[in-house]
């Protein structure tokens, strides 16, 4: 599929992009080449191939939560430069 100048300008307007003349010419060629690649892919016989959105086996990367002992709250708070009750007090970053 060959994209002409008007096609590129239409796509640019949809994407809210301002293009220079040289960019329009370059993108016309690049996008046309990209669409030609998709046309080739559309001709591939996929009979018997199950549709998928994942090309590699999906495995859960989540781990079970394990409760481990940690530092005592008072040990941590005793190292804070400033504290307020059971919280570390920091200076205001945004008003």
From Swiss-Prot:
Reactions it catalyzes: L-glutamyl-tRNA(Gln) + L-glutamine + ATP + H2O = L-glutaminyl-tRNA(Gln) + L-glutamate + ADP + phosphate + H(+); L-aspartyl-tRNA(Asn) + L-glutamine + ATP + H2O = L-asparaginyl-tRNA(Asn) + L-glutamate + ADP + phosphate + 2 H(+)
The organism's taxonomic lineage, starting at the top: Bacteria, Bacillati, Chloroflexota, Dehalococcoidia, Dehalococcoidales
Record keywords: ATP-binding, Ligase, Nucleotide-binding, Protein biosynthesis
EC numbers: 6.3.5.-
MF annotations from Gene Ontology: asparaginyl-tRNA synthase (glutamine-hydrolyzing) activity; ATP binding; glutaminyl-tRNA synthase (glutamine-hydrolyzing) activity
UniProt similarity note: Belongs to the GatC family.
GO biological process: glutaminyl-tRNAGln biosynthesis via transamidation; regulation of translational fidelity; translation
Quaternary structure (record): Heterotrimer of A, B and C subunits.
Protein name according to UniProt: Aspartyl/glutamyl-tRNA(Asn/Gln) amidotransferase subunit C
NCBIfam families (UniProt xref): gatC
Function: Allows the formation of correctly charged Asn-tRNA(Asn) or Gln-tRNA(Gln) through the transamidation of misacylated Asp-tRNA(Asn) or Glu-tRNA(Gln) in organisms which lack either or both of asparaginyl-tRNA or glutaminyl-tRNA synthetases. The reaction takes place in the presence of glutamine and ATP through an activated phospho-Asp-tRNA(Asn) or phospho-Glu-tRNA(Gln).
Name of the gene this protein is made from: gatC
Family matches, as Pfam families: GatC (PF02686)
Record field: transmembrane: none
């Amino acid at each position: 599929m060959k994209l002409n100048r008007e096609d590129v300008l239409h796509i640019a307007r949809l994407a809210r992009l301002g293009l220079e003349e040289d960019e329009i010419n370059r993108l016309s060629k690049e996008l046309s080449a990209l669409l030609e690649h998709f046309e080739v892919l559309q001709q591939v016989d996929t009979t018997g191939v199950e549709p998928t959105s994942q090309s590699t086996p999906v495995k859960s990367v989540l781990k079970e939560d394990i409760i481990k002992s940690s530092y005592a709250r008072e040990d941590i708070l005793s190292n804070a430069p400033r504290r307020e009750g059971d919280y570390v007090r920091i200076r205001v970053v945004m008003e």
